């Protein structure tokens, strides 16, 4: 892959410049604490930890982002706030006001890298937003099982299927359990202690 379109390269370049900027400040946020960069119109280099993004209207989780990452670019100058960011673990980050970030990106010719980061953000967020609007419990469960199956093996083996689905949807635990039992009975999936260990082709 061309290094100019490699998201990891773009994150590295942008994050290094944010950290070096004299106007950036370092912050540590505890697990469960909100990160107010969207409300404060800021961007941040997430140096360590994991953050989750939630819809304001109902608190549903729409995405999870691991360090290293540049966060906040997709929400700069939002007219109506729709999401908030919360720390899933203790996080450390370098934070910069968006207006200064704009000047920095221009001075250091970082706009192409910023574009790749925003594009990646939209790519991972929009499909997950669609999951929330599935019409039936079966559709919701199946789509989330596919998403879990796409995770790396270590993360998949530690992901609770019920927590994963319930945190992202207004759906009852009993409805999820019913679909899971049906899928297990038909041989489409295999579970072990609430974790997904096998996923076959599901219509």
Predicted feature residues:
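Cyclic-nucleotide recognition modules
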Residues: 62-118
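Cyclic nucleotide-binding regulatory module and flanking cytosolic helices
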Residues: 1-33, 39, 70-71
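Structural motif
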Residues: 42, 50, 90-92, 195
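Polybasic "coupling" helices that flank or enter modular domains
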Residues: 112-170
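His/acidic/aromatic-lined binding-pocket segments of jelly-roll/cupin-type domains
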Residues: 26-27, 35-46, 62-63, 85
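Glycine- and acidic-residue-biased ligand/ion/polar-headgroup-sensing regions
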Residues: 40-59, 67-69
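Phosphate-/nucleic-acid-contacting segments
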Residues: 147-203
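Surface loops and adjacent helix of pleckstrin homology
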Residues: 48, 56-58, 76, 96-98, ...
């Amino acid at each position: 892959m061309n290094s100019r379109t490699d998201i990891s390269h773009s994150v590295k370049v942008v994050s290094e410049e944010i950290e070096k900027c004299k106007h950036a400040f370092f912050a540590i946020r505890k697990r469960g604490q909100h990160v107010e960069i969207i409300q404060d119109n800021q961007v941040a280099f997430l140096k360590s930890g994991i953050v989750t993004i939630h819809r304001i209207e109902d608190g549903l989780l729409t995405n999870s982002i691991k360090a290293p990452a540049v966060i906040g670019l997709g929400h700069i100058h939002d007219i109506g706030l729709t999401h908030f960011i919360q720390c899933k673990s203790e996080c450390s980050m370098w934070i910069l006001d968006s207006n200064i970030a704009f000047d920095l990106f221009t001075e250091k010719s970082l706009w192409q890298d910023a574009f790749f980061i925003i594009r990646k953000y939209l790519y991972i967020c929009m499909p997950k937003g669609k999951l929330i609007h599935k019409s039936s419990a079966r559709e919701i469960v199946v789509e989330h099982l596919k998403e879990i199956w796409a995770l790396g093996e270590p993360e998949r083996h530690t992901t609770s299927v019920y927590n994963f689905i319930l945190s992202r949807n207004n759906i009852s635990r009993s409805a999820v359990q019913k679909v899971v039992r049906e899928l297990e009975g038909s041989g489409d999936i295999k579970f072990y202690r609430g974790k997904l260990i096998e996923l076959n082709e599901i219509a």
